[in-house]
Amino acid sequence: MEASRVKPGFNGVGMAAGSVNGSSRRPGPGLGYGYGYYMGSGAAAGGSGRAAQAPVDGCSVALRVFVVASTLVSAVVMGVDRQTRTIQITITDALPPLEVPLTANWSYSSAFVYFVVANAMVCLFSAAALAACRSRAAMVPVMVGDLLALALLYSAVGAAAEFGILGERGNSHVRWAKVCNVYGRFCDRAMAAVIVSLIGAFANLVLLMLNILTIHKSSSYY
């Protein structure tokens, strides 16, 4: 009778061994104790590390580099733009014309100063965003910054272009004479800087649209 109580597979040694083996198999990764628990925590840590890094899109990186380069070139070209010309002023017909050196400088125009500052700020922001392109937590702040940078660039381009057109054509209503016929090189450089900055602003717009599309695709609500 005593021997029948300790049959293998029932309340005896076999059942105890089976229970031990079963307990060692049941705690899966991250669910039980011992080795399975540590493996689970390691996998979770690896998953969290991978989740903290966003996948890098080659097209977005290329656009970001182009925005950095275009805004840097625009700020530098406009920042060094100046030209000095000697203007002949006739006081009376009896006297020879008076030669006066006059200088056109970008710092004389508030629109051009705003243009240089705006492009420099966007260049610095885009460089910082390029350095943080692998951080998933920085996606939304960078997207908001891109939106502000886009508004800043377009406003600066509009202000500089309006002042450039005024120098190219003048304004007959207020009797403002055109000056680009005298300072041709100055106006050409300013217009080149405005065009490059406008192309950079368009690239920033495309980049912002790509970021919005990426967040839309990765959202769990859609």
From Swiss-Prot:
Known glycosylation sites: N105
Pfam families, per database record: CASP_dom (PF04535)
Location(s) in or outside the cell: Cell membrane
Positions in the Cytoplasmic compartment: 1-59, 132-146, 211-222
Segments crossing the lipid bilayer: 60-80, 111-131, 147-167, 190-210
Membrane topology: Multi-pass membrane protein
InterPro entries per the UniProt record, alphabetical: CASP/CASPL (IPR006459), CASP_dom (IPR006702), CASPL (IPR044173)
Sorted UniProt keywords: Cell membrane, Glycoprotein, Membrane, Transmembrane, Transmembrane helix
Chain ranges on the Extracellular side, renumbered to this chain: 81-110, 168-189
GO cellular component, one term: plasma membrane
Primary subcellular site in the record, as a coarse category: membrane
The organism's place on the tree of life at top rank: Eukaryota
Description of how the protein assembles with itself and partners: Homodimer and heterodimers.
Family statement drawn from the similarity comment of this UniProt entry: Belongs to the Casparian strip membrane proteins (CASP) family.
Record protein name field: CASP-like protein 1E1
Organism the protein comes from: Sorghum bicolor (Sorghum)
Lineage of the organism: Eukaryota, Viridiplantae, Streptophyta, Embryophyta, Tracheophyta
